[in-house]
Amino acid sequence: MRRYILKRLLQLIPVLLGVTFLSFAMMRLAGSDAITELYGDKGAVSQEIIDAKRAELGLDRPFLSQYFSWLGGLLTGDMGTSYVSGRDVFGTFVSKLPATLLLTALSVAATVLLSVPLGILAAVRHDRFTDYFLRFCSFIGNALPNFFVALLLMQVFSIRWRLLPVLSEGISLRSAVLPTLTLAIAMSAKYMRQVRAAVLEELNRDYVTGARARGVREGVILGGSVLRCAMLTILTLLALSVGSLLGGTAIIESIFQWDGVGKLAVEAITMRDYPMIQAYVVWMAVIYVAVNLVTD
């Protein structure tokens, strides 16, 4: 086991290097940088000042020189300084993590509470109205993009019924309701079908047929054997959902102005804040790699 884990960890090194290199390259190919975004449209700022600022930040150096300089800093724990705010990237990033972790935890809990019972119910009521209805709802949930679900929930719960704030009022459970529901609806629609398939596969196995022939009650079969065998699939889905939520909440955090890592990343991308963008890329890469390792 130790050898396998060590082997997988060594395999992660080229993956992380490749991801950071590609993201670094794509940002440079965008055609503008943070200095252009900050001063480019201000006629009062001369080109000499812009060039001097770009040289101060090292943006005038060759691409590979910039990349290896950043990589060297990363290996020593220095992610650099934000081009826009002037603050330490690592400190800023860490300060936003609690909000994203809270949103992720709530979304995973809501996803499990929705997808697992509904998936089991659809499997138990296989080829009946309940099954067809739940599968139809799952299809609709998969088809709707997250931003549309977010706007729909805003319209209903915030604008029409005035039960919840439209935008975040700080890191609180009340402000977390709508972004949590948005993320949970989309993920539950996908995972419900997979839970249904896993449970249905177990229900069709020979040991279930034998248990039914011996007169074992359906509830005992489902709770004692089927769910235990299907738990591997459910736990795998849970692990993958954690990874996708930790790394993929940027749009939802921006819509609801939830002050987390995702919102920080969107602002950094808008302003071409390279050090902050790279921190987010490293975060996403580490999360997905770690989740895949744990799942394996």
Placement of each model-derived feature along the sequence:
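Residue-level recognition of pore/gate-forming positions within transmembrane alpha-helices
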Residues: 12, 20, 43-44, 139, ...
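Alpha-helical transmembrane segments of integral membrane proteins
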Residues: 2-4, 93, 97-130, 146, ...
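Membrane-water interface at transmembrane helix exits
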Residues: 23, 27, 31, 35, ...
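Membrane-water interface segments at the C-terminal ends of transmembrane alpha-helices
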Residues: 22-29, 58, 72, 136-165, ...
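An internal, D/E-rich "acidic patch" concept
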Residues: 59-116
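Hydrophobic aliphatic residues
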Residues: 26, 30, 38, 42, ...
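N-terminal signal-anchor/signal peptide hydrophobic helix marking the start
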Residues: 6-12
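Hydrophobic alpha-helical transmembrane segments of membrane transport/permease proteins
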Residues: 16-68, 161-178
